């Protein structure tokens, strides 16, 4: 079962979308708040502010794509159209590939849905080294729980494929601790195209 496309539903409910690539003349737009970037951070901020009654304008470098655009699952076109630098972005020394989304929704459109809590040692590091306050494991627990419920985050219940079963068996043999990575999906078809845009909005 495919789920309703949030962009199609949003536009139907009154979202106004302007594709600047086809504008023939300048436009003046008015808003209480302008947010640059429509990924997880920008999208969440826009939701909170709009629910508070503010008029929000979001600016996004990439195009607006819906699940209808992902039906053909054309890999070469997906990389070209949905990723920064055609999925060729990397750290300055070239050692780390940075698969960053370039579309309305940012990297939430093209990711592998891994969703885990910020580790306690990382929160402690932020507090000790960067003096970040109010983000201890105890402080963050209710927020993690809220988002896990909202985003349907849970370990994937499917049996491991043969590749992962080998890793599973090896970890057990070596006495290593292992866990299934929690994912933020609902109704996933296991098509394996998470990085190309989900055709069923899982």
Positions of predicted regions on the chain:
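N-terminal glycine-rich phosphate/pyrophosphate-binding loop and immediately adjacent elements
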Residues: 3-126, 137-138
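Conserved redox-cofactor binding core of oxidoreductases
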Residues: 1-14, 129, 133-202
């Amino acid at each position: 079962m495919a789920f309703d496309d949030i962009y199609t539903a949003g536009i139907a409910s009154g979202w106004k979308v302007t594709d600047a690539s086809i504008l023939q003349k300048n436009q003046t737009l008015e808003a209480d708040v302008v947010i640059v970037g429509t990924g997880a951070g920008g999208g969440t901020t826009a939701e909170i502010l709009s629910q508070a009654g503010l008029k929000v304008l979001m600016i996004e470098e990439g195009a607006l794509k819906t699940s209808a655009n992902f039906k053909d699952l054309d890999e070469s076109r997906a990389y070209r159209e949905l990723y920064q630098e055609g999925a060729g972005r990397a750290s300055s020394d070239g050692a780390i590939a940075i698969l960053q989304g370039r579309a309305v929704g940012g990297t939430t459109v093209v990711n592998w849905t891994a969703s885990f809590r910020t580790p306690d040692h990382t929160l402690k590091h932020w507090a000790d080294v960067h003096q970040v306050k109010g983000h201890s494991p105890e402080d963050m627990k209710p927020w993690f729980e809220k988002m896990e419920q909202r985003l349907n985050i849970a370990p994937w219940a499917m049996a491991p494929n043969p590749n992962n079963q080998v890793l599973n068996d090896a970890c057990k043999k070596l006495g290593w601790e292992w866990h299934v990575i929690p994912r933020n999906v609902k109704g996933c078809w296991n098509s394996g195209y998470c990085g190309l845009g989900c055709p069923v909005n899982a």
